Structures are given as structure tokens and as C-alpha cells.
Amino acid sequence: MMSVIPAQWQPYWQLARLDKPIGTLLLLWPTLWALWLASAGVPSFSLLLIFTAGVFVMRSAGCVINDYADRKFDGYVKRTASRPLPAGRLTAVRALLFFLLLVLIAFVLVWQLNQFTIYLSVGGLLLAAIYPFMKRVTSLPQVVLGMAFSWAIPMAYGAVVGQLTVTTWLLFLANLVWTIAYDTMYAMVDRDDDLKIGVKSTAILFGQNDRLYIALLQLGTLTLLAIIGWLEQLTVSYYFSLLLAAGLFIYQQWLIRHRQRDACFRAFLNNNWVGMLIFAGIMLAC
């Protein structure tokens, strides 16, 4: 794919992670969960288009501001040393301008929605902007990331029904907990490097109890999603999707059993299938 991108645009492409769609997908699935549940299985095409485009744009913006914040650290981490900023292929000023451009595009998209959702979008922007800096001040940056990755859920409910329901916040919490679980796996990949440079994470905080805490978070995710199914009176196909998701969580636990970098990263990537399965269950159950 990179071979067809003009050389001068390749650093921007990589900065926005357009060559690595996993983050976009992990943000997209809960957004689709919310749109389908809020609209009783019949979301409007215009809302689908706006929110899907918004996911792509804001995920890219989040990656850009993350790399800007980490530009002085990424060169010391094996996985991130080749990124455009630490590698010197793009300046910090250009990265900031690119971030502002993406935020402007996101603002144009959200401006098509109702006033309540526009107000809610401010919270999402703030979370996306502050998350990268949380790794310096707290051992729980994954909580802030989870909030940022869940913020499209109240926005979806705001756009569809104009209010935030009990299901809205249960779904928000379920996705928050799930995000902490899978991003802890992601942080396990960099744990040794992060310890050397002073970057904090739940992987470091949990230490040798990391697998236990991830398992508890995964159990919490499934429990909250099951409660949502009961509240929304979803059919058995939804619960079957949760059962399959539980199977994937067990597989992820097996992958991370030795805490090897590649295996932890594979476990992280596997969460894409979790999100897709739950979405399929919601689609069939609504």
C-alpha cells in the first residue's frame, strides 16, 4: 500500500496510522454497537456515514497528537523508533498542523448533528488531546484512553435519541473496561522499554498480576454487556455472541501466558474479532 503513496505524503500516512487500521476498528465497533442499540437496529444511513467517518478522522488525530507528545521518547522504544517524528521524517510543527486539520474535519462532521451531540463532542476532543500526556503523570493512562475510545457511545445516543440512557452508560463502562484490558496487553509489549524511560502504564502497575487483572476486566466487560442484553431484551443470538467473545478472551489469556512481546501483540489484535462478534450479535438481536 505504501508504494502507491507519494513519498512526501508517506510520513503523514504513517503518523495517522492509516497503514495500521486496528485502532480504527477497535474504535469503530463500540460506535456501531451504540448506533444499533440506540436506533433499535435501524440507524439512519447519514448517521452511519458521519460516525464512521468521524471514527477514522478522530482515531488519526489521536495518533498524531500521541506521537507529538511521545516524540522525545519513541526513539528509545523498539516498536516506535521508526515512526516519522523520532526518525526525523516529519517536524513537530507539521505534525501539530496536521492534527489541527484533522480536528477541523471532525468538527465539520459533527456540525451535521444536533446541538446536544455537538456539545458532547467537546469532551471527546479533550480526552483525545490529554491522553498522550497521562503516561507521564499516572499509572492508569489506559483509563483515560478507555474514556476516549468510549466517548462515541454517548455521542451516538445523543444523535439518535437526544438523551443519555442507563444503557448508554452501561455500554460506555463496558467498553471502557474492555479497552483497559486490551490496551494493557498492548502495553505489555513495551513494558521493558517503558520502565527504562519512565513511561507509566497499567502493564507496569499490575506487574506479575497482569493476567489476573486482565481476566477480571474481561469478565467485567462480559457481565456489563449481558446486563445490557437483559435491559434491552435482546434475543439469544446476542448472548451467543458473548459466549464466543468469552472464548476469544480465554484464547487471549493463553497467548499472554508467557508475556512474550509478539504473543501479547497478537492477543491485542485479536480483540478486533471480539468487537466484531458483539456487533454481529447486536445486529441479529435487534
Swiss-Prot record:
GO terms for cellular component: plasma membrane. It is an enzyme of class 2 (transferase). Its main location: membrane. The keyword DNA-binding does not apply. InterPro entries: HB_polyprenyltransferase-like, Prenyltransferase, UbiA_prenyltransferase, UbiA_prenylTrfase_CS, UbiA_sf. The chain crosses the membrane at residues 22-42, 45-65, 90-110, 113-133, 142-162, 169-189, 212-232, 236-256, 265-285. Belongs to the UbiA prenyltransferase family. Keywords: Cell inner membrane, Cell membrane, Magnesium, Membrane, Transferase, Transmembrane, Transmembrane helix, Ubiquinone biosynthesis. Its EC number is 2.5.1.39. Pathway: Cofactor biosynthesis; ubiquinone biosynthesis. Catalyzes the prenylation of para-hydroxybenzoate (PHB) with an all-trans polyprenyl group. Mediates the second step in the final reaction sequence of ubiquinone-8 (UQ-8) biosynthesis, which is the condensation of the polyisoprenoid side chain with PHB, generating the first membrane-bound Q intermediate 3-octaprenyl-4-hydroxybenzoate. This is 4-hydroxybenzoate octaprenyltransferase. It is a multi-pass membrane protein. Its cofactor is Mg(2+). It catalyses: all-trans-octaprenyl diphosphate + 4-hydroxybenzoate = 4-hydroxy-3-(all-trans-octaprenyl)benzoate + diphosphate. It comes from the Bacteria. One of its GO terms (molecular function) is 4-hydroxybenzoate polyprenyltransferase activity. It is found in: Cell inner membrane. One of its GO terms (biological process) is ubiquinone biosynthetic process.
